[in-house]
């Protein structure tokens, strides 16, 4: 099974591109399910699914054609279903503090619950093996990053905290429970967490396997969107998830300027050209697909088919377009070292230019942009060297 995740800032066109990718694959005979994890669902809108049919689905898959299903996950319903006792305990805890019942119900959905619940579907569909391709339309970038980090966080909690917390509560419940009216988690709460974790087991290996999972970053040729895409790229690399393509959406076609002779559009086109060039430079060697701004909104199968053709041409959308990790950050002898893939680079002078949040590396004709995590932004590049097919930068 192939799993393709689409991530990006809100409004860049993730949902439409997810829908177009899924539809194209279904036309190629692949069994596909496209799942929207974005709370502001618009996946069914892309396929022009009637409102009544969406309501009937109640968060379950909707069949589009023989090979394609779509699903808009109802997070509230899923959390109540899968978290069970955990959700009810947190709701009770908030209610005990004096919060209104409705507000307590809303606040009982803690940060991370939505992402972990969504991961259940990744594991479920992968294990069942009823589809050739699973496409995930992720929430905006921040939540996407949390989504890929959650398996690691959950594993750490279960290994380091869970058993101790369970034991403490078992000992404390009989005595502390008589001294306070604040509810304490009972054994059912811990059993629910344990069962939940069992359902999630193995999903982290699925997400970091480049032969199975790819993330495609959807961006627009604008400064703020580009910056967010760069940060997302860095974090996906740090979590070991393969980014196999960047899709630059809503690029103004040059022929429109020639036909309309509009100075307003021409100015925007020149701005976009600048950022497209930056995107190609920054994300290299990850392939960048440029998608023109269309003259009408992309709704319905015919327009989705047209969009997919503009993105992928004759390439199958489930192809792994790139698998090499461009760079990684590790510790060596107490220092942080940035390893950059640079096949064919010879041992010659290395130029390093450090900006506020990145390092630009030049060696001959080779150029790479390395986004720095917060921990490294106050450090300076001490030295650099070429070792086999890598450039090593030592930070201090």
Swiss-Prot record:
Q: Name one GO molecular function term.
A: ATP binding
Recorded catalytic activity of this chain's protein:
arsenite(in) + ATP + H2O = arsenite(out) + ADP + phosphate + H(+)
Any idea of its EC number? 7.3.2.7
Q: Which residues bind ATP?
A: 8-15
Concerning InterPro entries, the annotation shows: Anion-transp_ATPase-like_dom, ArsA_HSP20-like, ATPase_ArsA/GET3, HSP20-like_chaperone, P-loop_NTPase
Q: Which domain of life is it from?
A: Bacteria
Main EC class the enzyme belongs to: translocase
TM ranges = none
* Pfam families named among the record's database cross-references: ArsA_ATPase, ArsA_HSP20
Key words, A-Z: Arsenical resistance, ATP-binding, Nucleotide-binding, Translocase
Entry's family note = Belongs to the arsA ATPase family.
Q: What does this protein do?
A: Anion-transporting ATPase. Catalyzes the extrusion of arsenite.
Spell out the PANTHER family in the cross-references: ARSENICAL PUMP-DRIVING ATPASE ARSENITE-TRANSLOCATING ATPASE (PTHR10803), ATPASE GET3 (PTHR10803:SF3)
Q: What is this protein called?
A: Putative arsenical pump-driving ATPase 1
The organism named in the record is: Aquifex aeolicus (strain VF5)
